[in-house]
Regions:
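Enriched but not universal
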Residues: 1-17
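Active-site and NAD+-binding cores of ADP-ribose-processing enzymes
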Residues: 14-134
Length: 134
């Protein structure tokens, strides 16, 4: 749906999509590697999705994340992410405040507005914050 836009945004940052995905995996492996094969996570380049790929493959399942919101994020290049942990490279994050609250229990929920290219998406519900890749 928005693949051309995402690829154009990544190209504007002087990096190809394949190189971006490869660097994303390198960052994740160095900051928060998946050490098992039964949890959802990113282990290889094949697991990395762009925001557009994630939402084209499955719609959001959390009621506080709408298709219109995701479309506006893709158009602006920015998205607000939430996490039960401080948001640093390697942190699992979600566009859903509700989902982050479920994970945090009675603890704080952290949020940050980031580039849509600073998240390696796993699916439409969650991804891993990787920071800005150049």
């Amino acid at each position: 749906m928005y693949n051309n836009l995402i690829n154009r945004i990544i190209r504007l940052e002087s990096i190809t999509l394949d190189k971006w995905k490869s660097k994303a995996v390198d960052i994740i492996k160095s900051t928060n590697p998946m050490l098992d094969d039964y949890h959802v996570g990113i282990r290889t380049v094949d697991d990395v999705l762009t925001l557009e790929e994630a939402f084209d493959s499955e719609p959001p399942t959390n009621p506080d994340v709408s298709d219109d919101y995701i479309q506006s994020c893709i158009e602006s290049g920015k998205i607000r992410i939430y996490s039960s942990k401080r948001i640093i490279p390697g942190t699992f994050a979600t566009p859903s405040k509700m989902m982050a609250k479920d994970y945090s229990g009675s603890s704080n929920v952290f949020s940050k507005i980031v580039s849509i290219n600073s998240i390696a998406w796993i699916n439409s519900d969650e991804g891993v914050y990787i920071g800005n890749i150049k």
